[in-house]
Regions:
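Hydrophobic h-region of N-terminal signal peptides that target proteins for export
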Residues: 9-18
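A periodicity- and composition-biased signal for non-globular, repetitive helical segments
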Residues: 8-9, 79
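Positively charged n-region of N-terminal signal peptides that target proteins for export
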Residues: 1-4
């Protein structure tokens, strides 16, 4: 009896600990809300996003780079008060994040990654991120990426790339630190907007509000 109770308690504590680790961030736009789940195996990127969301850093920044069947990108602090048609994408926060590139985190449709410049360490921007829209990939394309990055895709990863799509050529080059779990229809609406020659939407698309999603309390009991 005591042993069974101990096991039950340990299982309960494990479930509580697991629930506490799940972090979600919401982005409100005029087209609707996007909810991202942040990965725990990229802790520095996760914690950076948490910090910026808590400080309201992203509020009023724009999705300044939109390329259909590729990505939508935002987070440039210079975009908050940018003039129409101004080139964006060079604004920064003053630091980089060490690369946390994992073979299990791929650029499938809905993946959230951090932008970066051409630095050899593949360190990420401290603030600019992107969401993958992508397109379906072929086995030949995936084979080519495997040879380039020196890592094999799992059968599940291949299936997702071939059916749902993504941007596999980015794998191994950028840190993927999350996944959109709600609002890909919103991402698609943003991706469909008209853009200028610099891939900036001709009509500003702002992140009205970026916040941590409050965890709902769950109660266990006998009913």
């Amino acid at each position: 009896m005591k042993k069974s109770l101990l096991i039950a308690c340990l299982c309960f504590l494990g479930m509580v600990a697991y629930a506490q680790k799940e972090t979600k961030v919401s982005i409100e736009t005029e087209y609707g809300k996007i909810v991202m789940l942040l990965y725990n195996n990229t802790p520095q990127h996760r914690d950076n996003m948490i910090k910026l969301a808590k400080s309201h850093f992203y509020d009023s920044t724009l999705f300044h780079r939109v390329i259909p069947n590729f990505v939508i990108q935002g987070g440039d602090p210079q975009s908050k008060h940018a003039q129409p048609g101004a080139m964006l994408g060079n604004g920064e926060i003053g630091y980089r994040i060490p690369a946390e590139i994992n073979t299990e985190d791929c650029h499938i449709r809905g993946a959230v990654g951090m932008a970066r410049d051409g630095n050899p360490k593949k360190e990420s921007s401290g603030c600019q991120f992107y969401i993958v829209t992508g397109k379906p990939a072929t086995d030949a394309e995936l084979d080519n990426v495997e040879r380039t990055r020196g890592a094999k895709y799992t059968a599940a990863q291949r299936e997702i790339y071939k059916t749902q799509g993504g941007t596999p050529h980015l794998d191994g080059g950028y840190t993927v630190f999350g996944q959109v779990i709600e609002g890909m229809d919103v991402v698609d609406k943003i991706s469909a907007q008209a853009c200028d020659q610099n891939n900036r939407p001709t009509k500003d698309i702002a992140m009205i509000k970026v916040r941590l999603v409050k965890k709902k309390k769950k109660f266990l009991g006998i009913f």
